[in-house]
């Protein structure tokens, strides 16, 4: 795939406006056009690790005539708290931020989740633009309009559906990404392959080592294909009334692991274990063939993602899953596969089957 800019449309549903996801290199020149002439002020929310990037972006926007401020927040999941959100609200209030002004969220998935949540809640909703800088945030967090913060009770339990006005995926940002962060994001890419686009799996399996680096020949295509999977789903189901649930493949157990680890595990690592579990659950429930279940193990292992978690933590994980957003009443709900690219819901599975599936994951 060439380095030309790819534009992916995300359709407006549930009263939201349609928007574009741009994928390419050197895209920040597009930012002013997305912000528009109506905005007087722009707030750049960025993590501590991207302080230089955030300040450079603020300076560039100021040079374009905007009253630009940079709001620095903690790195990774430590940013997704009510206290950090309140810190951002205070900064917006002190700068006189109005409904015509714009928030720009720069960084990984946690940063864009927070920026979107702050935008959703300030003055009951202001426009925001996502500038994701990791694989995870490009293919997942920044697309689709889910915003949120974590609480002691679980991950993303407080949040809002508030789609961005646009998303800029500048692939140059991936060049300096630590390898573990890059590989973590591949979990969401692989998920897209299993639930909707098997060509993604073929590209990775052809050269797993090349898939582990942004310099790989298929990096742009893998990211574009993954974004298109999510864009198609959320365009028809913004608020997770039905189809969008398939994007939670691997996430029920994954989120439970993240909570159990107090959000010190990378999201992609937890989702990788969650997909391995979901594949075994689908197999044991008589839904998924052996070859596709085994393919989960081989492709995740080939790119260096984890397959296992501590067996003795199963009771805690079950309790965590009971407060998962996807649960209905007292019934646990899992996304499983009836076959490759055939996701479906498995509701209230037998606890013995769940334990047996976890037996393949636990160590």
Swiss-Prot record:
It is found in: Cytoplasm. Its main location: cytoplasm. Pathway: Metabolic intermediate biosynthesis; chorismate biosynthesis; chorismate from D-erythrose 4-phosphate and phosphoenolpyruvate: step 2/7. Its cofactor is NAD(+); Co(2+); Zn(2+). It catalyses: 7-phospho-2-dehydro-3-deoxy-D-arabino-heptonate = 3-dehydroquinate + phosphate. CDD domains: DHQS (cd08195). NAD(+) binds at residues 109-113, 133-134, 146, 155. InterPro entries: Dehydroquinate_synthase (IPR050071), DHQ_synth_AroB (IPR016037), DHQ_synth_fam (IPR030963), DHQS/DOIS_N (IPR030960), DHQS_C (IPR056179). Its EC number is 4.2.3.4. GO terms for biological process: amino acid biosynthetic process; aromatic amino acid family biosynthetic process; chorismate biosynthetic process. GO terms for molecular function: 3-dehydroquinate synthase activity; metal ion binding; nucleotide binding. Belongs to the sugar phosphate cyclases superfamily. Dehydroquinate synthase family. This is 3-dehydroquinate synthase.
